[in-house]
Amino acid sequence: MKHLMSLIIYAACCLSAAVMADDVDDPRGKMAPWEKGAWETGQYRNVFLEAGYKQEDIDAKLAKAYYDLFEGPNRVYFEVGEDMAYVSDLKNKDARTEGLSYGMMAAVQLDKKEVFDRLWRWTVKYMQHQDGPREGYFAWSVNPETGRKNSQGSASDGEFFFVTALLFASNRWGNDTGIDYYAQARRILDAMWSKDGTAGVRNIINTEHKM
């Protein structure tokens, strides 16, 4: 479900049109790339702030994008019971690993732990294979009304985004608040490079080329 990430990116890009201030000059060519990344420096670059936008305008735009996607009348996020939720591909009337994993990535970056945990619990229950040749992998499409898998196979971008989001969550919230995020991420990673071809299920990560 690529619509969620596309909308998030679109919302960020719309800052240039929606909150353009009269005193913000065209920033192109004025912002030199950093010599070191955030992983090394511990500082995450806010290019909109560097470009001259006000922090309150940036925050308001992000809050509006989150509201539209997760809370508003046209949301794609739906809660199930007391502790689960899924992201719907409204057009195709299913839930997909791309949508769930993108939703988790948005939740962890915006410090929405309850939303993150709800999405992950639904994912584990209805998408993740718990045994057999596909153990650790995810069914890429599920009917959210019945919980039945539309396809047993995986779409690797979902696996990669699940791992990334879980590692982010481990770093942000720790692993002793109800879900061991690191252990969950490690389980997926271990599955991604340990398949032996049984039933045609193969590694997602190429162990020879580390890709």
Where are these regions (language model features)?
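Positively charged n-region of N-terminal signal peptides that target proteins for export
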Residues: 1-4
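Bacterial N-terminal signal peptides
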Residues: 6-16
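Boundary at the C-terminal end of the N-terminal hydrophobic targeting segment
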Residues: 17-21
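Low-complexity, Ser/Thr/Pro/Gly-enriched N-terminal "stalk/linker" regions
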Residues: 22-98, 109-144, 149, 200-203, ...
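Aromatic-rich carbohydrate-recognition surfaces in CAZymes
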Residues: 93-103, 149-173
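Solenoid-repeat scaffolds in large eukaryotic assemblies
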Residues: 103, 115-116, 178, 185
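Aromatic- and glycine-enriched pocket-lining scaffold segments that form the walls
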Residues: 167-211
